[in-house]
Swiss-Prot record:
It catalyses: 2 (2R)-3-phosphoglycerate + 2 H(+) = D-ribulose 1,5-bisphosphate + CO2 + H2O; D-ribulose 1,5-bisphosphate + O2 = 2-phosphoglycolate + (2R)-3-phosphoglycerate + 2 H(+). Its cofactor is Mg(2+). The modification N-acetylproline is found at residue 3. GO terms for cellular component: chloroplast. Residues 1-2 form a propeptide. The disulfide bond which can form in the large chain dimeric partners within the hexadecamer appears to be associated with oxidative stress and protein turnover. Mg(2+) binds at residues 201, 203-204. It comes from Tsuga heterophylla (Western hemlock). This is Ribulose bisphosphate carboxylase large chain. InterPro entries: RuBisCO, RuBisCo_large_chain_AS, RuBisCO_lsu_C, RuBisCO_lsu_C_sf, RuBisCO_lsu_fd_N, RuBisCO_lsu_N_sf, RuBisCO_lsuI. The record marks 334 as: Transition state stabilizer. Binds 1 Mg(2+) ion per subunit. Its EC number is 4.1.1.39.
Length: 475
């Protein structure tokens, strides 16, 4: 143990404030396979050296406090402290740098995303010595990830449950998101599922409001999907949002969904909280329910480049906490999402092993071992003209979700669903025949219009719709 980090009581106690870097900046440290590693984008206050700022992040997110305390002598800081082990500049940003911090595994409760985040992204984000702080990535070691159940079922089990293979799944968010009665809501669900969609969805803020109580919605939606299943011969689902004001109420809704025999429920995992989400995920695995996750509130946390937390971290947290689907941006629609960044965290959701790749924002190699994968959901401002790009970008293991792009069809909900299903089938067939969807996608859609009047009408309505804004989150 070096003199700088000696903590034995025999050394004696000297009160006062000391530099964080004397204890928590350790560039000679060799990271362990069991360490949780973090990459922080740090913007220190003027005059604060990078080493001191990086050490402050390590200290305040682990064992440190602002002054020396005599109880330091009652434990071994070398065993429990976080360490800033590397600092690298951010190209083009003179006042920013990336601080790499290693945390010993014993700092965290097993199977608890709540505890993990309370430490790593807790009080340190309000630290006065820092102008801004952003958590860019985490490396979760197998020794820790194996303490989590993870997704209730995962990609392959979901495909087996639905008996659907070789293509992305199709969904639709029912609109208007608020104000419909339960019966009219169920009617919209039925029309969309009958037209060819695999799923329909409650919007994230549909819970149990005066115009539509949750139990009524659940009953009418279950009736709609059973009727659509009988007519189409396909397994259908509706994401019944179980999010509620208390965990007890959330579980009551999930239990009722199971009693209705529906295949899937939904949760808003950030507004609902990780403790509630993990509780629901465990119930879903035990009772055969798929779990769709909405990321409402994520942009409050992840959209600013200098402060907060990147969505790739929230995606990893969700995979550990549990969910079979999660919204992940579209690249081409109305919501934020640069292509390489989006594909980086899509791989972190789906794959077992993801190599470090800074060109896609992946700071650490991530080994999920046997944890099931999560289907990314592309949703937000997409329509039939986006189908070739979405198929090419996200591949088969995804859910493509068209709300306005289904319900906005001039002939109604069912024709809107038909248009999306025909466009998807045409794109998948063209891809399987070796055609380049990135180059020939529009031609593929136009050809399909010749034998689908529903698709032709949709193409005419949305031919001029574009969302041309620069992305904020870029590499």
């Amino acid at each position: 143990m070096s003199p700088k980090t000696e903590t034995k009581a025999s050394v004696g106690f000297k009160a006062g404030v000391k530099d964080y870097r004397l204890t928590y900046y350790t560039p000679e440290y060799q990271t362990k396979d069991t360490d949780i590693l973090a990459a922080f984008r740090v913007t220190p206050q003027p005059g604060v050296p990078p080493e001191e700022a990086g050490a402050a992040v390590a200290a305040e997110s682990s064992t440190g406090t602002w002054t020396t305390v005599w109880t330091d002598g009652l434990t071994s800081l070398d065993r429990y402290k976080g360490r800033c082990y590397d600092i690298e500049p951010v190209p083009g940003e003179e006042s920013q740098f990336i601080a790499y911090v290693a945390y010993p595994l014993d700092l965290f409760e097993e199977g608890s995303v709540t505890n993990l985040f309370t430490s790593i992204v807790g009080n340190v984000f309000g630290f006065k010595a820092l102008r801004a702080l952003r958590l860019e990535d985490l490396r979760i070691p197998p020794a820790y990830s194996k303490t989590f159940q993870g997704p209730p079922h995962g990609i392959q089990v979901e495909r087996d449950k639905l008996n659907k293979y070789g293509r992305p799944l199709l969904g639709c968010t029912i609109k208007p998101k608020l104000g419909l009665s339960a019966k009219n809501y169920g009617r919209a669900v039925y029309e969309c599922l009958r037209g060819g969609l695999d799923f329909t969805k409650d919007d994230e803020n549909v819970n149990s409001q005066p115009f539509m109580r949750w139990r009524d919605r659940f009953v009418f939606c279950a009736e709609a999907l059973y009727k659509a299943q009988a007519e189409t011969g396909e397994i259908k689902g509706h994401y019944l949002n179980a999010t509620a004001g208390t965990c007890e109420e959330m579980m009551k809704r999930a239990v009722f969904a199971r009693e209705l025999g529906v295949p899937i429920v939904m949760h808003d995992y950030l507004t609902g909280g990780f403790t509630a989400n993990t509780t629901l995920a465990h119930y879903c695995r035990d009772n055969g329910l798929l779990l769709h996750i909405h990321r409402a509130m994520h942009a409050v946390i992840d959209r600013q480049r200098n402060h907060g937390m990147h969505f790739r971290v929230l995606a990893k947290a969700l995979r550990m906490s549990g969910g079979d689907h999660i919204h992940a941006g579209t690249v081409v629609g109305k919501l934020e999402g640069e292509r390489e960044v989006t594909l980086g965290f899509v791989d972190l959701l789906r794959d077992n092993y993801i190599e470090k790749d800074r060109s896609r924002g992946i700071y650490f190699t991530q080994d999920w071992v046997s944890m099931p994968g999560v289907l990314p959901v592309a949703s937000g401002g997409i329509h039939v003209w986006h189908m070739p790009a979405l198929t090419e970008i996200f591949g088969d293991d995804s859910v493509l979700q068209f709300g306005g792009g289904t319900l906005g069809h001039p002939w109604g909900n069912a024709p809107g669903a038909v248009a999306n299903r025909v466009a998807l089938e045409a794109c998948v067939q063209a891809r399987n025949e070796g055609r380049d969807l990135a180059r020939e996608g529009n031609e593929v859609v136009r050809e399909a219009c010749k034998w689908s009047p529903e698709l032709a009408a949709a193409c005419e309505v949305w031919k001029e719709i574009k969302f041309e804004f620069d992305t904020i989150d870029y590499l």
